[in-house]
Amino acid sequence: MLGVGDKFPEFKLKACVDTTKDMDKAFADIDNSSYSGKWKVVFFWPMDFTFVCPTEIAAFGKLNSEFADRDAQVLGGSTDSEFVHRAWRNDHEDLKDLPFPMLADVKRDLTSDLGVLDRGAGVAQRATFIVDPDDVIRFVSVNDLSVGRNPQEVLRVLDGLQTDELCPCNWEKGDETLNV
């Protein structure tokens, strides 16, 4: 698995970006240069139409404006197709108005390059990456497939990384950093 300090791999994936009936607006090509110069929060879930996954995705959606205020683009994805993403978004009330792209890694290239493809299940692990504007991975977290992650904690870590200071345990934006 790629870790902190590694370069985030190049990619080009289809994404579901809208639930409109106009198929030209429902999908987009997203690649590593789509959000050049921005922080990126890239997270993966195992499968669409499951139970834990929509709780996390909706939570990231609710915090999207907080991430945007920090000049960070949220990108979520799984190994499902963009069409499955769109069907799920249309079917699930909490996902209809997601403000970020749902990446479709159907060939499993990005999840393999990152080292977060669960070989046994053939799906993405529940992984989260914070990537800086230079495309360097600054944070990685992987949860068991059965346990959802905490998007608020991802936001807290992003805040800490953006200080370029030493942040103690349980530090939150606005708290003092360590002076050494």
Identify the residue ranges that each predicted region occupies.
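Chalcogenol-based redox active-site neighborhoods
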Residues: 1-180
